[in-house]
């Protein structure tokens, strides 16, 4: 009712999980507002399990998360991928490496996202960590990227994050280094119910691909390196 009173003719409810970087949506949402100002766009930050339930229950029209393991009745389409980097505090001994071997990373404590709040991110990181025969030492599990990088900056632990997340944080005390070898990628997926989309949703999905294709590519070498 309030949306109609404000002059909106349609609504698009978008769920975000796994700490999806808000800057990824700036160009997309700006384009939506320019093309269809009559569409009321609502964003909801929720855990992945809640997003999936909400999509099934028609609480959300579409969502973004870092997992394609969403069960029956939900479609997961890759939207974009981000190179994984190691977030390292300034003046840390690992900064002698331009590309850090994963087994060297695991010699130090890690700060991770809460697996309940960042389920998809946690699954992708767990798969990467299983590629070496070393048990990670998890110093802390946190609810936000900001707190994760604050702990890194303070020297408590290292973290594994997407390069665009690290670039967006603008913290001079946190330096990004790619992993040695072929850099793993963190993939973000667009999730929606496996039904014919509404015209409004269909136009939104059509906008995602060109926005993502035209987005700057964050290669590991472009990741912020300060005082190194």
Locate each region found by the language model.
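Alpha-helical linker/hinge and terminal dimerization helices associated
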Residues: 1-5
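Flexible hinge/capping segments at coil-to-helix
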Residues: 6, 74-84, 88-110, 193-194, ...
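Central regulatory/effector-binding core of bacterial HTH transcription factors
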Residues: 9-72, 142
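Short, well-ordered beta-strand segments
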Residues: 11-15, 63, 87, 111, ...
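A late-sequence structural motif
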Residues: 24, 175-218
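Hydrophobic hinge/microswitch elements
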Residues: 47-52, 56-60, 65, 116-175
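Beta-alpha-beta core module
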Residues: 72-78, 82-83, 97, 146-195
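Secondary-structure junction motif
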Residues: 110-132, 198-206, 215-216, 220
């Amino acid at each position: 009712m309030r949306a109609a009173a404000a002059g909106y003719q349609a609504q698009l409810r978008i769920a975000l999980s796994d700490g999806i970087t808000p800057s990824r949506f700036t160009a997309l949402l700006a384009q939506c507002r320019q093309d269809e100002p009559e569409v009321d766009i609502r964003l909801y930050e929720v855990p992945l399990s809640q997003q999936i339930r909400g999509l099934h229950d028609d609480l959300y029209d579409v969502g973004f998360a870092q997992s394609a393991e969403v069960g029956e009745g939900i479609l997961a389409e890759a939207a974009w991928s981000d190179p994984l980097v190691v977030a390292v505090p300034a003046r840390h001994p690992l900064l002698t490496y331009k590309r850090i071997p994963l087994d060297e990373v695991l010699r130090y404590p890690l700060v991770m996202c809460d697996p309940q709040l960042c389920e998809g991110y946690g699954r992708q990181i767990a798969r990467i960590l299983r590629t070496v025969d070393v048990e990670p030492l998890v110093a802390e599990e946190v609810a936000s990227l900001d707190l994760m990088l604050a702990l890194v900056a303070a020297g408590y632990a290292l973290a594994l994050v997407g390069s665009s997340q690290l670039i967006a944080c603008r913290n001079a005390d946190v330096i990004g280094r790619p992993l040695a070898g072929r850099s793993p990628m963190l993939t973000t997926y667009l999730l929606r119910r496996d039904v014919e989309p509404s015209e409004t949703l269909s136009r939104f999905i059509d906008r995602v691909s060109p926005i993502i294709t035209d987005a700057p590519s964050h290669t590991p070498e472009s990741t912020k390196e300060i005082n190194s």
